[in-house]
Amino acid sequence: MTWPDLRHATRDNLDALLALYAQLNPGDVAAPRERLAAILDRIVESDEFAVVVATLDGAVVATCYLNVIPNLTRGGAPYAIVENVVVDAAHRGTGLGQAVVRFALAQAWRRGCYKALLQTGVRDPAVHRFYESCGFSAREKTGFVARPPARIAPPGG
């Protein structure tokens, strides 16, 4: 396999990213494209966010999201969150997932992050081994998730 080009996504990558995210979360309700384009613009323009992509022959085939979060503890060192790791189904098992995650982590370390966090809802031990091969440990922290309460319809509506 030819080694991919690893870089930050651009506005021109929106459609390719949406196709990958459909593989990651097939049941997601699609948001209006204009809204998603505005979100990607915000990410692209920020120094604290990045959508990392791997491209082969110009096609986006893998991605992950990096969020560098300012912090008032740990001597002011920021920390990072890595999310939305997905490799196109035709390219899984080729090292592209590890490549985008390691690229994101390298950026986090260059930005002075003292740790990077990642959560997965997948229970498959192979997926856990994948994240461990990228440098993550499941033994250091316990993760919790809160979701907003269900929306209650207004009276008469």
Task: Outline where the language-model segments fall.
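Conserved GNAT acetyl-CoA-binding A-motif
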Residues: V101, A108-T120
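A short helix-loop-beta-strand connector motif used in the catalytic cores of GNAT acetyltransferases and
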Residues: D41-V53, I81
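A conserved beta-turn-beta hairpin within the catalytic core of GNAT-like acetyltransferases
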Residues: N71-V82, R92
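A short beta-loop-alpha structural element at the N-terminal edge
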Residues: P4-L17, A30
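Conserved beta-strand-loop-alpha-helix junction that forms the acyl-donor binding cleft
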Residues: L117-V127, V145, P149
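Conserved beta-strand in the GNAT
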Residues: V53, A59-V68, I81, V86
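Conserved acetyl-CoA-binding loop-helix of GNAT-fold acetyltransferases
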Residues: V87, G93-A106, E132-S133
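Conserved GNAT-fold acetyl-CoA-binding loop/helix
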Residues: L18-D41
